[in-house]
């Protein structure tokens, strides 16, 4: 789990 993944998940 990375910061980039966190951002992408939040945008889903």
Curated annotation (Swiss-Prot):
Out of the domains of life, which is the source?
A: Eukaryota
Q: In which tissues is it expressed?
A: Nacreous layer of shell.
Protein name (record): Uncharacterized protein IMPP9
């Amino acid at each position: 789990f990375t910061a980039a993944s966190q951002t992408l998940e939040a945008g889903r």
